Amino acid sequence: MGLRTSSGSPLVKPKLYKTSASNVISLAEKQDRFLNLGELTDLNTYFSSGNRRLDIAKVISLNANLIISRAADRIFVGGSPLSFLERPQAAVTLTSDQASSTSIQSTKGLGNGNIFQNFFKSTSEAPTGFKPINVVRYGSSNMKKSIRDLDWFLRYVTYAIVAGDTSILIVNTKGLRELIDKACSSSAAIVALKEMKNVSLSLFNYDIESQNIVRLYFNTLVSEFESPASSSKVRKRNSLDLQGLAIPDIYLVAADKSLRYVMKPNLSNTEKAQVIKACYRQVFERDIAKAYGLSLLELESKLKNLQISVKEFIRALGKSTLYRKNFYEGFTNSRVVELAFRHFMGRGLSSLQEFRKYFAILSSNGLDALIDSIINNSEYAEYFGEETVPYIRGYGQEAQECRNWGSQFALFKYSAPFRTIPQFITLFADYTQLPPSQHCYGKLNDPLNIQFGAIFKNSYVNEQSRPVLFPRGSRRILVYKGAGIFNQLGSPNALEKPPSNVSIAKWSKETDLNFILNAAYLRVFGRYVYEEEKIALRPLENEFKRRSISVRDFVGQLAKSDVFRSLYWSRLYICKSIEYIHIRLLGRPTYGRTEINNYFDIVYKSGFYAFVDSLVNSREYIKCFGNDTVPYDRYSTPEAVSSSIFRLSFINSVSYKSLKPKIEKFIQLGVARDAKSLSSLNSKVFQGVSQARSQKRVFKVSDYSNVMNLRIVFYAALRQVFERNIEPYIKGGEFKDIESLFLSGKISVRELIKEIGSSSLYRKEFYIPFPNTQVIEFCTKHFLGRAPKNQSEIRYYNQVLAVQGLREMINYMINSKEYLSVFGDDIVPYRRFPTLPAANFPNTQRLYSRQTKQNRNIVVPSFSGLLNTV
């Protein structure tokens, strides 16, 4: 699992700002309590001032041009700065009543109703180093950006006034001074902001309370702009297998931070009780004293009297019977490790190596040892120490690793204890699998293969948040409609050759134009258009009937029509729209990230119409369809092909059942089940134990001086371990040295088998690509000549493999009593149960009869008892 691995799910939208109401409610929600009197008073104050805040925002918005003009005239000379202001298209339009009432209020606030009396007055002091900027020298592009920035600053102030919190100003202006210094002058920006503040205050000359509100937020804007940019919060890692962590400081400002409880000697009894409740909420994920009336009174008294620290109190809660019953007994060891990290470390597992370490501790020493190892960790001491209660280190607290993104957020949910299936180890295992043949940005982006428009799978039906790692150069498999030899990847020159099993609508002088029109409508829209929709398309249809445009131009114009855009572009997510339009116009799904990223670039830079033109004018379209052919389906996804086959088989089976005559039961019972033919009689005569047991050959060394016999045994050992003849691969390297040692008689057959199993080639072929359970099956097959006996043996070797590695597990098998009693030092291992009767024949037969590399399924032992333990 690489350091750049990304989980990719679920979607998390960072919080961009706070509000006065959300701050109060969030604090009470995190403490699991109702609002107190002071918080209710704060909410009442905020909501009672709501109308005033909205009026202030309206007045400032209506006089935005005046405020920006005064600020721009203060720092720019030699032109009209306001002419460069470009209002956004989504600006809010006030009604006539609102505009009239607001204009009256704003005019009265400017001092005796004379707006121009204060227009040329400047009350802001220029900082040191300020020089006015010449409009002509500054340039049109820079002027538009500067005036746009002033407009943004003013809008941020109105947003903050309505929200009742300054976080939106801090997030959007902190650290901009260094950025603006590179473009023009930060001193000029400060002068403009102060001028905007003075003009805004002059709008409320007769309302001191409104002036105080405006002054508060403008002062915050100026101070945050002047403050230096804060560096990102970086989390250094102590291992090379962990991803680096860094999060911008503005995310920490806007996010809801976790409450941190610290036990101090000078706390009151009420505050100490809150710390104890926080410990319960963190470890048990709920306040057990409030919800169930449970508490650990002895431990609570020791903590209140400072006889033990918070760290030891958390340790005692983890080792309690209540924690063992709720988070250990009903879960697998893998899930226990995941939940323990959530409770005691405030995060999820970071890597597979970390999981293996703590899984081995839990498996060998139990739950208490796992909790001790987590709490005694240096990371716990760095974050929480002796006095701080552990807290959830989620989004906004610190940067989150991308390779466990989805599982980490699922672990932080309240429903995490109700999920018994381990998530992190399953996630880490998915990273080693080959990517499936699906859309590179999620299988929900592939439309259903039906003729009812753009219909996609629902993300809430059988939802799975397991990621799929698609490299940049990956290309998914598509099924060609015709002969596979003519696919465009294997035969690029065969693009002009249409599939043999697809009906094609091609225009010619003899072809009916209505047929081409209907085929084009059906292809582009996925259905026949309605009469109301056809009215808008009538001019385009008449132009095609006059043969003024070709079929290709007609298809492109249909895709650019308002009807098509409203159906398959405006209402869909852009990735789904691109995929569906690509299928309709080019006749195949997209291949992978490289192709669809190119379409993303075209859409965001040039728009929808340029995207349609890029498809219709592409080399692939012209080669396949030309100017006179309506596009047709050339490729399908494997899922679409399988679903169509299933539908056809289902329809055929239903029709066959309906036509099949019903036979009475007494007639069925009177007919013999099978005819006694001569061949069936002969097969029953020769049934029994086959000749495979007597025909097997055992390779044994009786004389180590016979070099020819030793060479035969050497190659037999290689075939036994690698299941094939690898003679071409032993010309040099480690097998050449092993061969020379064996032919000289310095090592025995058993030592030869051990050296072959410890080779790097065996590790590459039978260990790295497979999970541990399948590795154990391969090793028992190669070194013991059989399948695993039972689940107990698999668990035993699984523990050896996880803790000590592949080499030690092979040594355990070769040095076992079973190996020595069956093969000894001089016999090459062989298949021990080729026929019945044999105790382990079913599993051994299944293991030997299947293809090793093509089958990733695990042979599950058929024994239910655990009598033969290792």
UniProtKB/Swiss-Prot annotation:
Origin superkingdom: Eukaryota
Gene Ontology biological process terms in this record: photosynthesis
GO cellular component: chloroplast thylakoid membrane; phycobilisome
Domain PBS-linker: 241-421, 482-665, 679-856
Matches recorded under Gene3D superfamilies: Phycobilisome linker domain, Phycocyanins
InterPro entries, A to Z: Globin-like_sf, PBS_linker_dom, PBS_linker_sf, Phycobilisome_asu/bsu, Phycobilisome_asu/bsu_sf
Localization per record: Plastid, Chloroplast thylakoid membrane
Single GO term (MF): lyase activity
Any Pfam family the entry gives: PBS_linker_poly
Keywords tagged on the record: Antenna complex, Bile pigment, Chloroplast, Chromophore, Electron transport, Lyase, Membrane, Photosynthesis, Phycobilisome, Plastid, Repeat, Thylakoid, Transport
EC number(s) stated in the UniProt entry for this protein: 4.-.-.-
Record's comment on post-translational modification: Contains one covalently linked bilin chromophore. This protein autochromophorylates (Potential).
Binding site for (2R,3E)-phycocyanobilin: C184
Membrane topology of the entry: Peripheral membrane protein
Family stated for the protein in its record: Belongs to the phycobilisome linker protein family.
Function: This protein is postulated to act both as terminal energy acceptor and as a linker polypeptide that stabilizes the phycobilisome architecture. May have intrinsic bilin lyase activity.
Designated name of the protein: Phycobiliprotein ApcE
Organism, as annotated: Cyanidium caldarium
